[in-house]
Amino acid sequence: MNMTVFLLAAVVLLTGAAPVFADYQKKAEEATDYIQTHFYDAPAKRYRPSFPVDPKALPYDFMWANGVQYSAVIAAARWNPAKYRKLLTDFSDGMESGYWDPQAPVPGFNAYCSGPGGTDKYYDDNAWLAISFAEAYKNTHDPIFLKRARETQKFVLSGWDETLGGGIFWKLDHHSKNTCSNSPTAAAALHLAQLTKDKDQLAWALKIREWLAGTLQDKDGLYWDCVTTQGKVEKTKWSYNTAMVIQTDLLLYQLQHRPADLRAARRMADAGLTYWTDPATGSLQKTEKSPRFTVYFCEALLRLYDQTNDKKYIDAVRHQADHGYRVARDPQGGYWDNWKDGSHHPDERKSLIENAAAARLFWLLVPYTDPNPGM
C-alpha cells in the first residue's frame, strides 16, 4: 500500500469520517446552481463577489474570481449542455462587454469591469482565461472560443521581457515575475499548439518552462511564488503554481513523447502530495485554507492519473472533494472559504471564488465513475 493511500485510510479510521463518495455531478450542479441563485446578476451577465451582498464592496467581482467561475461554467456546459450552454454564452458576453479592453496597446482583460482604457491588467488573469477559452473550444468547437484564446494569449505573451533572464510579469506595473503568470501561460501555449499545430506556441512553452525551472523551482521540485525585479525570491509554495507546471509537463509529454517530462510531472505531484496533504484530515489543505488554489492541484493530479492510471492521484482528489463537502458545505449547498477545518465566523459572507472552486472540483470528477478509492 503506497504512503498516500495509507494516509487516507488512516485518517478515515482515526477520525471516523465516513466517505461521502456520491454522485459528483449532483454535487457539481448543486454548487453551480447555488452560485447562479446567490451571486449571478442575470441582466448584467456578471457575478457579485459575495453572498450576502456587501453594500460597501464593488458590485461585481474581479477577473480572478470570474476566471475560476468561468472554468466551472465551461465544465458545466460540457456535462449538461441543455442546462448550462446558454449560461456559457451569456457569461462570455458579460466578460467581454465589461472586462475586455480593445483599446489597450495589446488588447486584454482588465482586472475589473472598468471598460476600455483600463490600466489594471494582470497577465495571470488573462493566462487562466486563455486556458479556459481553449477548453471551451475543445468542448464546443465554436470558433469564437479559439479566437478569444489566441487574442488573450497574445496579451499574456506581451508581458515577457529579458529582465531577470526572461519570464512574464505578473501585472502591468512590472514589479515581479510570478509562477502564476508563467506556468499557466506555458500551459495555454501548449493547448493552442495541440489545437492549431502552432509551432510558435510550442516554442514559447519551452522557453517559459526553461525559465521557470531555472528561476523559481526549489530542490524538492515545487515552485516558489515570484521573483521581484530586484532579484528577491518570495518562497511561498502555493499549490496552484506547481499544479500548472505539472500540467505543462504533461502537455509536453503528449506533444513530444519525452519520458523526462512525465517523470518530472510525477516528481512534482508526489512532492506536492507530501507537502500539502494534511496528516490530520488527509485533505490537501495543510498549508492553505482556500480551495481556490488546491482545485488546480486536483486537476493536475487527475491529468496525471489519466496518463499513468496510478490510483493514488485520483484517490487524493476524491478525498479532497469529499472532505470539502463534509466540512465546508452549508445546508443550502454553498461553501465557506475555509476548507482546512470548515470553521467560520457567524457573520462571514460566502465568496464567489471559493464556491466556483468547489463547483469546478466536482465537475472535474464527473467522468470518473468508480465510486471507491483504490485501497
Which role does the model predict for each range below?
Residues D23-A72, A76-D124, K177, R266-R267, ...:
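CBM-like carbohydrate-recognition segments
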Residues R85-L195, L202-L206:
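Extended ligand-binding groove/face enriched in aromatic
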